[in-house]
């Protein structure tokens, strides 16, 4: 994707490039970055699985730590991205820079708070997340280095989202890919060559996150972006805070509910044995590879919608939504079909002698593959609402997948089908999300058409 120094050139690119060319140009770097990141998470699990089922379960438990850190950054990151893209579209560049700087330093503070609390209450937190006596020692080793990286991880979310928001998706991709490739290279070195075991996997991840953060900061230091990060631009405003929290709350609660859902699944699954716990987490890691593709496409579409909405180009909002919906749902359906067919060979990569892990994992993975088209639809509708500043629909969809549609059916499915209910609950929840996503999509689409028919009536761009 071309890079621009002149703000007017970038606006022209965002507002006049044909949608079938613009959305893929914006989405492909995001998809690549998200897929590579998911791949190294998967590789991390694959390498650790060579240490045994207990170690694999420990990595699954610590996945909730990652989500807690993500919560710290996503509230600010998603809200800042939505607001800055609309501000840039409306040519309010200086205010957009102040929004980014404010959110960056607040995310740094939140990440530091997670680090301090995590080390202070480490054992209690890990037990709460679902660790048992068998996997607690591994969980403690893995948790240590991840917590040290928390401030960099939290601020990386802000950097990533705001780079995409201004159309600089390539910079975002480079940072994510470089960190992922480094992690895959360091994992076998630290785990096996140095003999550090689970702690080696954690150290590799922490170092990779730090390197990724440095790369994401580079375009801001070299002034290759429309936005800048300066402490003198740290200017909290109540009006901006309300807007950022309103838009970021969807991601915040989604990650919060994802953390809670993961904790509940871990605590219930461990009652059926360590193999069941490991199977659920391995299947979820593989599924994350597919959901990341959906999310990456949505993150490419969101700034297109935001820029167009801020510039009152409602025809482009409508066209980009339609194009993105068709492309995302069709693409993820094809990928899910392939993964579902080869589910068993994929699970066998993670264990050679644990038949129970493979049996439960294959079932869970195939159920989630069936639900992928529904998930893709929900992601695009959510990104549309986020991009154009529709906080309430965005929040509802953010709460749906691992909240509104998840928690009510979890106890019922566990009661009826035991471990098989646990294995299929996420797929069932994804299907139920459609009950919210379809009416929201219809209502928002009607409003876009109305504004388009009125030739962009008087509205606030932010």
Task: Give the predicted meaning of each segment.
Residues 1-27, 84-151, 193-249, 305-371, ...:
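Short alpha-helical transmembrane segments in multi-pass integral membrane proteins
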Residues 48-67, 134-138, 198-201, 240-247, ...:
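Interfacial/gating helices of multi-pass transporter permease domains
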Residues 28, 32, 62-68, 105-109, ...:
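Hydrophobic residues within alpha-helical transmembrane segments
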């Amino acid at each position: 994707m071309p890079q621009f120094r002149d703000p007017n050139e970038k606006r022209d690119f965002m507002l006049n490039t044909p949608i079938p060319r613009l959305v893929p140009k914006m989405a492909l770097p995001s998809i690549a970055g998200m897929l590579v990141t998911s791949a190294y998470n998967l590789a991390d699990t694959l390498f650790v699985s060579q240490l045994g089922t207990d170690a694999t379960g420990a990595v699954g438990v610590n996945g909730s730590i990652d989500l807690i850190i993500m919560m710290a950054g996503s509230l600010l990151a998603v809200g800042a991205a939505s607001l800055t893209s609309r501000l840039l579209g409306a040519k309010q560049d200086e205010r957009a820079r102040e929004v980014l700087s404010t959110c960056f330093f607040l995310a740094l503070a939140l990440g530091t708070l997670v680090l301090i609390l995590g080390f202070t209450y480490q054992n209690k937190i890990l037990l709460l997340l679902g660790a048992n006596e068998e996997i607690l020692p591994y969980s403690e080793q893995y948790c240590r280095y991840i917590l040290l990286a928390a401030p960099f991880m939290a601020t990386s979310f802000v950097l990533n989202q705001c780079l995409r928001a201004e159309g600089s998706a390539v910079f975002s991709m480079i940072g994510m890919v470089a960190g992922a490739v480094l992690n895959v290279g360091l994992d076998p070195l630290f785990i096996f060559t140095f003999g550090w075991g689970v702690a080696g996997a954690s150290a590799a991840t922490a170092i990779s996150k730090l390197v990724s953060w440095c790369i994401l900061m580079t375009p801001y230091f070299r002034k290759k972006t429309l936005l800048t990060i300066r402490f003198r631009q740290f200017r909290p405003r109540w009006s901006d805070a309300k807007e950022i929290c309103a838009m970021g709350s969807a991601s915040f609660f989604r990650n919060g509910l994802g953390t809670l859902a993961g904790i509940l699944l871990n605590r219930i699954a461990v009652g059926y044995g360590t193999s069941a716990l490991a199977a659920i987490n391995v299947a979820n890691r593989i599924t994350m590879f597919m959901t990341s593709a959906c999310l990456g496409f949505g993150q490419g579409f969101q700034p297109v919608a935001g820029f167009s909405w801020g510039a009152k180009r409602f025809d482009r909002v409508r066209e980009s939504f339609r194009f993105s919906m068709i492309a995302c749902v069709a693409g993820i359906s094809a990928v899910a079909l392939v993964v579902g067919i080869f589910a068993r060979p994929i699970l066998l990569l993670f264990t050679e002698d644990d038949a129970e892990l493979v049996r439960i994992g294959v079932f869970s993975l195939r159920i989630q593959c069936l639900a992928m088209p529904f998930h893709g639809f929900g992601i695009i509708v959510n990104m549309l609402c986020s991009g154009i500043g529709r906080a309430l629909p965005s929040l509802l969809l953010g709460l749906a997948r691992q909240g509104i549609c998840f928690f009510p059916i979890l106890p019922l499915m566990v009661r009826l089908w035991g471990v098989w209910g646990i294995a299929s609950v996420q797929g069932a929840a994804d299907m139920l999300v459609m009950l919210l996503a379809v009416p929201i999509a219809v209502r928002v689409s009607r409003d876009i058409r109305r504004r388009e028919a009125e030739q962009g009536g008087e509205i606030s761009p932010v």
